[in-house]
Amino acid sequence: MPMYLRQLMEAYIRQKRASPGMVQASDLQINRPMSGMRSNSRELHAYDGPMQFMSSPQNPDQILTHNSSATSHISGNNLISVGGAGSRNNSNNLRTLSTISQEADLIEEISSHELEDEESSPVPMQEQQKPLPLSANSTRPRTRQQSFSDTLDEDDYANRNIAAAAPVRPAGMAASPYKEANLEGSNGTANGGESEGDVIGNIDQFVMQPAPQGVLYKCRITRDRKGMDRGLFPIYYLHLERDYGKKIFLLGGRKRKKSKTSNYIVSCDPTDLSRQADGFCGKLRSNVFGTSFTVFDNGNKDSTESPRLDLAVIIYDTNILGFKGPRNMTVILPGMTEDDQRVKISSADPKQQGILDLWKLKNMDNIVELHNKTPVWNDETQSYVLNFHGRVTQASVKNFQLVHDSDPEYIVMQFGRTSEDVFTMDYRYPLCAMQAFAIALSSFDGKIACE
């Protein structure tokens, strides 16, 4: 680059630095020893080192006498000079309009051709760059993620917390539409019009009553591993969560001894978990392989006045090849009437078919079919994930969300682990506490053909 072009470019850069649009650090001090002490009166320049000689008045190659600390403003025929902190003689800053105009045109022409080079261009001060995060393949330890390595069970998978939903009544519940105007919200919580449920009336009646529309019941299940027979049959307790850590007992369940298949007794009396107890609410029974579970109420299958009713059927997909991954489950419920009550279906009644038989025959008029929401594979955590919105904190193969195919964003029920023996269980319409608790109990039971 010719010498005069380089000098003009330096003058252009000095003028640009002194303009109001640029902010220049005037109080930046470099910590270096200077005769054993720091001088607060040391004059600071734009260039420090060999480049400082370029801005010196004694520079033999200096052509322009323009002071870099002054900025000229042209307003009509008047010339206004604004002196900077390093200006000593403002009279040297005044020049004719023609000279400034010619220099500006020449500088603009030079800058348009991008004639800067590394020697003449000022080197700006740069902040120290932060190290980039290591890639997923690096060995740098990450913060704890919900993945298979963090599981408590060897076949657990990761998850997240409750996807939001504007409820839509699924097929089989189309008798009355949802009050969508009162249930709109981005997270399905009370902020969007949905309220948290509370116990109304007696416990034994409440646990059998379907959840009202627009109400979310947040519950917690605790597992007592001591249970019965030295821990062979744990006891499970369901509580409704209240504010400030309070809770209300709803149901208790345990596995029956001396039963050919898995058989759970559910009662609203925590002190007496037996079929003969006054608080007996129903039972959960599985097939031999543990792939199908049926939920019954407390009725008598041999009674004609109060026959035993089917409350739900839970079917787990078989996994004969033993592939690891989340479970796939199907839940069939009785349909809902116009007044939001369950359709009475009894497999004990020889005059009608049970829920499982209706589902096998594809007779969906009086039943509702739900499925677990398919988790999404996360490449970063190398795990399957679901959005539980803070309600689930640990990975487990037992974590699931139940949805209807017509509206996958309406979470009918969700269940997941928060600690080794504590789980959260949230449910909505059309489930009742008995149905939701029985579905959760089925996830605890061992499944020969599903693991």
Swiss-Prot record:
Pfam families: Tub. Residues 135-150 have a biased composition (Polar residues). GO terms for biological process: protein localization to cilium. Signal peptide: none annotated. The keyword Lyase does not apply. It is found in: Cytoplasm; Nucleus; Cell projection, Cilium membrane; Cell projection, Rhabdomere. This is Protein king tubby. It comes from Drosophila willistoni (Fruit fly). The lineage of its organism: Eukaryota, Metazoa, Ecdysozoa, Arthropoda, Hexapoda.
